[in-house]
Structures are given as C-alpha cells and as structure tokens.
Amino acid sequence: MIQALLVAVGGAIGSVLRYFVGQWALRLMGPAFPWGTLAVNVVGCFVIGVFAELVTRKFNASVELRLLLITGFLGGFTTFSAFSLDAISLFERGEAVAGGIYIAASVGLSMAAVFAGLAIMRALV
C-alpha cells in the first residue's frame, strides 16, 4: 500500500507541475502551438535519463524512491519520458529492430487510437 501511495504523491506533484508549465507556456507563447506539452515532454525525457542513471545505476536507490520519482513524478509530469526510456533501453540492449518497431507502433497506434476515439465520440455525440 505504501508503494501505491508513493506513486500517487509523486504523480500528484508531477501533474501539478505539468499544469503550471502549460499555463506558463500559454501566457508566454500563446495558444498557436502546444509549447507546454512539448516542454514537459522534452524536460521529462531529460529528467528520466538523469533519474534512471542516478537512481538505478549510481546510487542503487530503493524501489520506493524509484516509484516516487520515476513512476509517480515523471508519470504525472509526462508519460512520454517512460516511452522514450523504454525505446532507448531496447537500442542499448542491441535490439534495434525491436526498438524501431516499438517506436513506430507506439506513435502510430497511439495516433490511430486518438483518431478512433475522436471519430467514435463525434459520431455518438
């Protein structure tokens, strides 16, 4: 139960921070381009790289700290960072074909799922 609570706390903090970054970007840059989403995705990818190296490799941190920072905080801040780490991990293990398939499938299927969800709701509503 404590592990789920750590994920929830980290997720809440990450989500609130994502909201503030989005609002800041909207005020600074305007609504013409999703700058806030781009910013959290890029920053989240950088931070997951830092956390993955420090927390799992350099300091051998506890499962609880990993859940709080990586699963919780970055999961709330951006899920794109987890996707990127998974893809890089495949490439680092020498599984370039699997990495390419994972990237193409993730982006392609996710886009298709959004289009399908939009189409279904537009047809029903």
Swiss-Prot record:
InterPro entries: FluC. GO terms for biological process: cellular detoxification of fluoride. One of its GO terms (molecular function) is fluoride channel activity. The chain crosses the membrane at residues 1-21, 32-52, 68-88, 101-121. It is a multi-pass membrane protein. Na(+) binds at G75, T78. NCBIfam families: crcB, PRK14195.1. Belongs to the fluoride channel Fluc/FEX (TC 1.A.43) family. This is Fluoride-specific ion channel FluC. It comes from Rhizobium etli (strain ATCC 51251 / DSM 11541 / JCM 21823 / NBRC 15573 / CFN 42).
